[in-house]
């Protein structure tokens, strides 16, 4: 699952393309968060992968993995310029999607996951390919029929896919992962294209049958949505790319961003990361910034945790580990107070009909299959985000997704965990065996990061009209319901009424409805709640005799038979 990333943004996972945030200081201030001093920050391990070369015109001045940038700002990847790579990608996708549309639709077969189609693009053109001004290249498409099914499952039509990726130039993102990956975002902000290593592409191919089965069973998922896997062969090098959904829309200003694993070992953003326009903070930063966690409606919380549990089970079954939850936060209240200027306006493609956006997956759509609309979160437009609140009561929109899943727990990772565990507590290391990693990941997300707001009972009509409920509860001014966050993770609803000081009145829990025993279990003296009974105050139940119960049953039976 991927997201767009800004200028020099995160080197971990996928970041948000947010040109409106001018500096790290402003980003932190906007979210009301105090940052530690630079001397307290550990340098990220990936800094060791960056090599600086003495300045010379046309020579690379910075290189991370296969990605290098020269003094003129031109990016190359495996000795292929970024502009040539973007052109080759668009030419190849245009051809492969067009040729696939001429083939009749059918069910996906097992062999479809292993098909690789290849076509040569000479610069002078051929009877199948157009002429172009790039060097000759070959374009490979992996499992075209299977990926066509995936796109259809997510509601992406072939012409929409081509329009997004090939109608306008791709936008290169300046950030890269620790391995030096290249990132592109489509002009309409819908898709991310990322270069992947050979092992990652190979692992995705092996993952496809299980991925297909999982999507059939659970189309709503926070896992990355893979839309295509391709390879550009140019200059004797293979450049493999994957097309995914864009997690963070550029049209929404992100105030802060986190990459969370549930680990504490070296899980703090580096000083270099904090200097970026929109830094990607980590687990220790989150625990310091938001110790009380983020509050979601009960339905939303339950749906989110269930989705995380299901996704982690899938990842564990494939022995996948070291994945992260990328979470970007839009603070609605801060955004409403921020002055609008030309710098904060985002240029997104408006020529496309607005309803088209609904065809693509968002964080909200990934879990809303089980979450009911509405609740205590009052936002007119979620813009694809999950509504939440912080401990101050500020309204938030969360954009989340699981990223970095194309890694399996193999020998290298086992070795990495072994030597780390010799020096540090093994349970705090992020590289862990898949089963333990999944359990720790879920526990951290559902107990520390996300918290449940207790359900607020809807007042009955009698309560609104000031009838019997008001008389039982006393003065309406003496009754309120609040929730208070706690670092321990316990969040209880507090009901304050005059009944608290009146003996013999049991308040009960306002967020739980009393269970009425089945009729066949009712014996003499068993309490049966009256239809006008309100669970808020815990009014003493009326005691009905057996004769009254039988009388009601006879009336109900006569009404049913007639």
From Swiss-Prot:
One of its GO terms (molecular function) is phosphatidylinositol kinase activity. Gene3D superfamilies: 2-Layer Sandwich (3.30.810.10), Phosphatidylinositol Phosphate Kinase II Beta (3.30.800.10). It catalyses: a 1,2-diacyl-sn-glycero-3-phospho-(1D-myo-inositol 4-phosphate) + ATP = a 1,2-diacyl-sn-glycero-3-phospho-(1D-myo-inositol-4,5-bisphosphate) + ADP + H(+); 1-octadecanoyl-2-(5Z,8Z,11Z,14Z)-eicosatetraenoyl-sn-glycero-3-phospho-1D-myo-inositol 4-phosphate + ATP = 1-octadecanoyl-2-(5Z,8Z,11Z,14Z)-eicosatetraenoyl-sn-glycero-3-phospho-1D-myo-inositol 4,5-bisphosphate + ADP + H(+); 1,2-dihexadecanoyl-sn-glycero-3-phospho-(1D-myo-inositol-4-phosphate) + ATP = 1,2-dihexadecanoyl-sn-glycero-3-phospho-(1D-myo-inositol-4,5-bisphosphate) + ADP + H(+); 1-octadecanoyl-2-(9Z)-octadecenoyl-sn-glycero-3-phospho-1D-myo-inositol 4-phosphate + ATP = 1-octadecanoyl-2-(9Z)-octadecenoyl-sn-glycero-3-phospho-1D-myo-inositol 4,5-bisphosphate + ADP + H(+). Highly expressed in heart, placenta, skeletal muscle, kidney and pancreas. Detected at lower levels in brain, lung and liver. It is found in: Cell membrane; Cytoplasm; Nucleus; Nucleus speckle. The keyword Transferase applies. Keywords: ATP-binding, Cell membrane, Cell projection, Cytoplasm, Isopeptide bond, Kinase, Lipid metabolism, Membrane, Nucleotide-binding, Nucleus, Phosphoprotein, Transferase, Ubl conjugation. Residues 81-449 form the PIPK domain. There is a cross-link at residue 103 (Glycyl lysine isopeptide (Lys-Gly) (interchain with G-Cter in ubiquitin)). It is an enzyme of class 2 (transferase). SMART domains: PIPKc. Residues 506-526 are annotated as: Disordered. One of its GO terms (biological process) is ruffle assembly. InterPro entries: PInositol-4-P-4/5-kinase_C_sf, PInositol-4-P-4/5-kinase_core, PInositol-4-P-5-kinase_N, PInositol-4/5-P-5/4-kinase. The keyword DNA repair does not apply. It comes from the Eukaryota. Catalyzes the phosphorylation of phosphatidylinositol 4-phosphate (PtdIns(4)P/PI4P) to form phosphatidylinositol 4,5-bisphosphate (PtdIns(4,5)P2/PIP2), a lipid second messenger that regulates several cellular processes such as signal transduction, vesicle trafficking, actin cytoskeleton dynamics, cell adhesion, and cell motility. PtdIns(4,5)P2 can directly act as a second messenger or can be utilized as a precursor to generate other second messengers: inositol 1,4,5-trisphosphate (IP3), diacylglycerol (DAG) or phosphatidylinositol-3,4,5-trisphosphate (PtdIns(3,4,5)P3/PIP3). Interacts with RAC1. Interacts with TUT1. Forms a complex with CDH1/E-cadherin, CTNNB1/beta-catenin and CTNND1 at the plasma membrane upon calcium stimulation. Found in a ternary complex with IRS1 and DGKZ in the absence of insulin stimulation. Interacts with DGKZ. Interacts with PIP4K2C; the interaction inhibits PIP5K1A kinase activity. This is Phosphatidylinositol 4-phosphate 5-kinase type-1 alpha. The gene is PIP5K1A.
